[in-house]
Amino acid sequence: VPSVRARRLARWLRDFRRRAGLSQDTVAARLGWSQGKIGHLETGRNKASPHDVALMLDIYGVVTPEREMVLELAERAEQRGWWTDYTDVLSSPYVALEDEASMIGDWAPQVVPGLLQTPDYARELLTAGMLDNLDDREIERRLQARMARQTIITRTENPPELHVILDESVLTRQIGGPEIQRDQMHRLVRETRRPNITVQVLSASAGAHIGLDGAFILLRFAEEADPDVAYTEGFHGVVYLENPHLVTRCNVAFERLRELALSPEESAALIETAAEE
């Protein structure tokens, strides 16, 4: 899955070519590239180096200020994100998208989402959830990566809006024992006070609802031209949904869950009660 910057750059390259009235075959022939390379650059499947972008802009007749803007975007798309230090334990495509998101919607019917987990709570989940036999060092490595992810919600520059909907069972499911669970609830209480974080609880009394099919995450971006992405993971691995119809269904589902859930104020009170039990 291309990063947001890569998708944005790909869209600009595609639009410039079309504005120039050129086919992919024509551009490929002029540059001595394959048509497949042009196609991959225009979908973000392959990274476009600033050098390649400059060559394409020459052919398309793109001049400043658009030229400078797109070349700067190409350079930014090549920059290493913090997650590149954890590629051995993290899904780089997901964290790259998460890092660029302006809004993260997380339906969490089983456990507290990773962005809000305490280290001890996260360690218990990492240990219990591994089908492979990982040693302590590998588990700690994954834990470090998860804690590093959390810095996006506290950063001073453009932190995303995080909207979490928890199933009520998450508040009482013992992960690692009473003390770890209690500390996690206290952490949730603190996080609900951040202006960019909203936590709602879906009461057990809600009965049958659209979220019973499983957890999912919605990622929305600041620029309207950047389409939303939905994400889910499990034993099957990870699944990214970019098809507009499917993403719309996820958006509708999240909105229905939001309407069914307790208000943020009622939810905070319920979490505080769970923290004291």
Feature names for model-found ranges:
Residues 32, 72, 207:
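Positions that flank functional sites
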Residues 33, 82-83, 216:
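Tryptophan-centered motif/residue detector
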Residues 177-277:
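C-terminal regulatory/effector modules of DNA-binding transcriptional regulators
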